[in-house]
């Protein structure tokens, strides 16, 4: 054995076309957690997923851009459903799973805001405490 993984993390961001991407993102997250556990059964697995609640987003692929607009109601509904599936399907695959919600457009001047900054900070801090506790117990 060359190395032993003690903590492994996977991070996925869904910025647009949420429901078109959800299966690929869920497979990536859960696959990463399972792969890590196969190789290092005692490893602490941490999953992060970020969901964009913005009505507008500009995707970039090389030199091409793809502007997307959703109604406010559509953005809310699609983002809520994406967040629900992430928690329900990906969450249980990890020892710790943190869902981050934000608004960003990927358009100048590149505005960004957490939906609930205080709540995200509290959830992140609590996750770090639990991870540290798990680390002390496992290693």
List PLM regions with ranges.
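C-terminal tail/extension regions appended to the core domain(s) of diverse proteins
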Residues: 55-139
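Short, charged, amphipathic alpha-helix that recurs within catalytic cores of restriction-modification
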Residues: 22-39, 85
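Nucleic-acid nuclease catalytic cores
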Residues: 38-60
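Generic beta-strand structural signal
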Residues: 5-7, 34, 41-45
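Surface-exposed cleft-lining segments at the edges of enzyme active sites
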Residues: 12-24
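Structural beta-sheet core signal
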Residues: 8, 46-49, 99
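Conserved catalytic cores of phosphodiester-cleaving nucleases, focusing on short active-site segments
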Residues: 1, 5-15, 29
């Amino acid at each position: 054995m060359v190395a032993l993984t003690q903590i492994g993390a996977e991070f996925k961001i869904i910025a647009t076309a949420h429901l078109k991407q959800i299966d690929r993102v869920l497979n990536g997250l859960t696959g990463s957690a399972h792969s890590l556990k196969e190789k290092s059964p005692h490893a602490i697995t941490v999953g992060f997923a970020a969901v964009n609640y913005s009505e507008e987003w500009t995707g970039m692929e090389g030199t091409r851009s793809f502007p997307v607009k959703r109604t406010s109601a559509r953005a809310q509904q699609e983002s809520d459903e994406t967040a629900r599936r992430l928690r329900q399907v990906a969450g249980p695959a990890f020892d710790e799973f943190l869902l981050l919600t934000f608004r960003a457009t990927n358009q100048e001047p590149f505005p960004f805001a957490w939906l609930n900054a205080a709540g995200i900070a509290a959830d992140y801090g609590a996750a770090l405490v639990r991870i540290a506790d798990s680390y002390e117990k496992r290693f």
